[in-house]
Amino acid sequence: MSRCPVKGFLFEMVKTSSNVLFTQLKRAAIVALCLFVFCEWLIYYLVIYQCSWPELHSEGREGRFDPLRIMLLTDTHLLGPKHGHWFDKLRREWQMERAFQTAVAHFKPDVVFLLGDLFDEGLYSNDEEWDFYVQRFHKMFDHSENTEFHVVVGNHDIGFHPEAARDSHLFERFSSVFDSPSVKLINIKRNIFVLVNSIALQGDDCSMCSEAMSQLHAVADKLNCYRRSKKEIFEDIVKQDRTFCELPKDSPPPILIQHFPLYRETEMSCTGVDAPPPDLKQITNREKWEVVSKEMSNTLLTLIRPRLVLSGHTHHGCYLVHEDGTPEMTIPSFSWRNRNNPSFVLSVITPERYALSKCFIPRESTVIAVYIIAGLAFVLVNFRPTYRYLKTRRTCRQITLDCCVR
């Protein structure tokens, strides 16, 4: 039997082509790994490091106060066991964890405030599911002991008023885990914060609402102690309700933090890249659902007399000034699940002044676009070598067949 004269040559061609294909596959694996690292880790540093603490312009005696640096975020909506696809849960929670950990490591805030709707299914979770929920939350939003962490409750954590009033256990377990009563007064570096449970501001006789109003008036008494007459203070001393004013006489007006925004008829006054779209701006807000009722909003402004109001709930950004001159910033959602361009707020505060700045985290559309563009570019660059390998294999197979036939 005669030997095929091109057998050795064909073998070398196939071997060379195989090496080329192996090299391409190895290169593809390296590119895929680098792309994954960039989109899932490095991009957060690249975007968040472009943000910075706002500059607090000093006036007069401003330098005598040590500025307080706070970070604010809201509406994280961790998915629960009943709703949402597992990949959706994995993707969006990884995004929030990376964004939060990157921001906290870089900015090192003194305090972090999360303005409600920590969970998406708090209302529907039994105690076992709730415990697992809380463990996931603490893992995602882990922070150093040098950073204080405070939260307020949202409607997805315990339900709107009808559900929360019907089952008091929902708010009780949230309050016990996060040390978050319906009304809480915090004094940090002489800056006063009042944290309020918006769900309890219904003005009815439910136990949660009654307790909230009692706590609200107690906090208002502390805030307005020095505004009261000497006769009123003396009467309290006699009753042993109070022996002295707890806050310093020169304490600044507080900052009010809650989940629901104060009453506003629509979102027409909201501006910015994260403001509601035009079709949503015109919709009338429902009291006790989208915003605090008009009556209770006036009560809060009268009792607390805040210098600033911070809220969440709408998933959109908004800054406005109420009729009495009180400014309010509504912070957008921190989750890709609620918007394409999530953000958080950095604030520098002293008893006399404050400054706010908004920091955006990577857009979900940007990350997806990077994956698609990089993938297509790699395929196009490597298409010709791969095509040549496949063509060589086909040619060699045909030549070998012809040689053997002869």
Task: Describe the role of every protein-language-model region.
Residues 249-267:
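Short acidic, glycine-rich surface-loop motifs adjacent to enzyme active sites
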Residues 67-83, 190-204, 254-259, 308, ...:
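Active-site-proximal beta-strand elements of phosphoester/diester hydrolases
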Residues 76-79, 118-121, 155-159, 199-203, ...:
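Solvent-exposed loop/turn segments at secondary-structure junctions
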Residues 2-131, 136:
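N-terminal active-site segment of His-dependent metallophosphoesterases
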Residues 72-74, 112-117, 148-155, 196-197, ...:
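Active-site neighborhood of phospho(di)ester-bond hydrolases with catalytic His/Asp-centered motifs
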Residues 50-60, 123-249, 279-284, 302, ...:
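Extended active-site neighborhood of metal-dependent phosphoesterases/phosphodiesterases
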Residues 40, 66-68, 108-110, 144-149, ...:
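Loop/turn elements at helix/coil->beta-strand transitions in domains of secreted/extracellular proteins
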Residues 2-4, 9-11, 21-28, 32-57, ...:
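Binuclear metal-dependent phosphoesterase catalytic core
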